[in-house]
Amino acid sequence: MKTTNLLTLPNDRQLAYAEYGDLNGHPVFYFHGGGTSRLEPLLLGDEEFTRLGLRLIAPDRPGIGQSDFQPNRGFSDWTKDVIFLADTLGLDKFSVLGVSSGGGYVAACAAKIPDRLYSAVVVSGAWEFTTADLLKSNRWSFLLIKYLPWLYRVSMKLTQRSLNAPPHKLLKNLKKALPRADYTVLEAPGRLQKSCEALN
């Protein structure tokens, strides 16, 4: 497992990516969800990917984690980054897996580069929804993004700062905010720390 690898793309942007599991295993590009990064697979653990015979390659999307921002980009721009990374790693074919908002990037790869893919999988993909479908905290986020983006940025900085709180305080706050099933997952030993790493 190597959680930080940096690659310079042809347009001089930096792309950060992590690798998990068996380096000789079946190659799978993992596209993280919203609000997380290339560290999201830490939630499952490197040993799980090794056990499954997978080589998981998890890049940060532009402007996330340690990858440089790319102005005016669309979903299809992502496929160029994926192809360059795959070529750099010597991978002719690979699978793609996207979680939540990473699903749109899987769809872009399936549409633009089907000849390079073994398979394309979306897990808990984002859907067309209204704010009424969301948890109250997420509803507020969408409204802030739309009407007061500067205030959303401030709230995200405060949220990020709260992730550095002592674990017992953080768990107490999360217990109030999360559904019981999600909170139960975070109570497992080491899970909270890995979740915080993925979000930072």
Language-model segments: which ranges?
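Short glycine-enriched, charge-decorated loop/helix-capping segments at active-site entrances
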Residues: 69-74
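Alpha/beta-hydrolase
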Residues: 150-200
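An N-terminal hydrophobic leader/cap segment in hydrolases
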Residues: 1-6, 18, 200
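Conserved acidic catalytic loop of the alpha/beta-hydrolase fold
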Residues: 77-95
